[in-house]
Amino acid sequence: MTRLTFWVALLLLLPGAQPAAPEAVSLLGKPLFPAPIAAEARRTLEENLKNAEIVYGRNPDDPDATIWIGRRVAYPGRYREAIEHFSDGVEKHPDDARMYRHRGHRYITVRDFPKAIGDLSKAASLIAGKPDQIEPDGQPNARNMPTSTLNSNIYYHLGLAHYLSGDFAKAADAYQRCLEFSKNPDMLAATTYWYYLALARLGRSTDANALLARITPEMDIIENASYHRLLRMYKGELTADSLLALASGAGLDAVTTRYGVAAWHLTNGRKDQGVALLREIVDGYPQQWPAFGYVAAEADVARAR
């Protein structure tokens, strides 16, 4: 019996349990279900998904329709269904890098890192020598201004999949490539953050610190403020306590910040403090399980067992 089958069987025995299977099993062996969504946000997600379903129903062979229904299905937490849509896209459009890019992302979400690496590596091979393109946002930021591109997202997620697998050297290589396509402050901050951590985990502190030269307080950050603040902390411009106090809620920023501080402790010889924060993330923020910082904390805890 697999871990997933075991947990489904156990949950079905509980009074009032829902029959739905978990979307994934954590690296620590726990079933992972979609987090509750506020009513207003859910209505918006459902309306957007309904529109995507209509477009897809009319154009099932259109690659854009396939991508959007896969993305819209994933936003409420239906990651397995999203993977099925992207797999259909891979079958119909095997030379479209976008299908592998999006499926690879969702393989990361469900903790299948080998498949994520396979898809994202394939995507990287398909974009070789081709011009980059802006990737439209499914959940636009405050300025309705996309901050990433197809190429940057492919290498960003490939680096992350390697990082989560504990292969920090390959993660660093991917993020070095990602920097070539990180053309705005938000993407520069996000890429530099994970690249810095990968180098730090390799003991390459001089190389890691050299990356921070491009990070300044004046950067016009739209959506990656947590990464930007963490990089400034690594530079010595901000304190860990001030960042943790600022991210004291229960949302994504809290997990992102705590992981960034935990990794900083771990790579600077403060293992006990780092591990304590990792446990705080895993035990205290279960509804944030799809967040990259949460997955990274889970991976670090799992490797240490």
Can you describe what each PLM-predicted range is?
Residues 71, 105, 160, 197-200, ...:
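Residue-level recognition of tetratricopeptide repeat
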Residues 60, 94, 128, 149, ...:
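Short coil turns that delineate tetratricopeptide repeat
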Residues 18-64, 68, 305:
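N-terminal leader/linker segments that initiate helical-solenoid repeat arrays
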Residues 54-55, 88-89, 122-123, 144, ...:
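Canonical positions in the second alpha-helix
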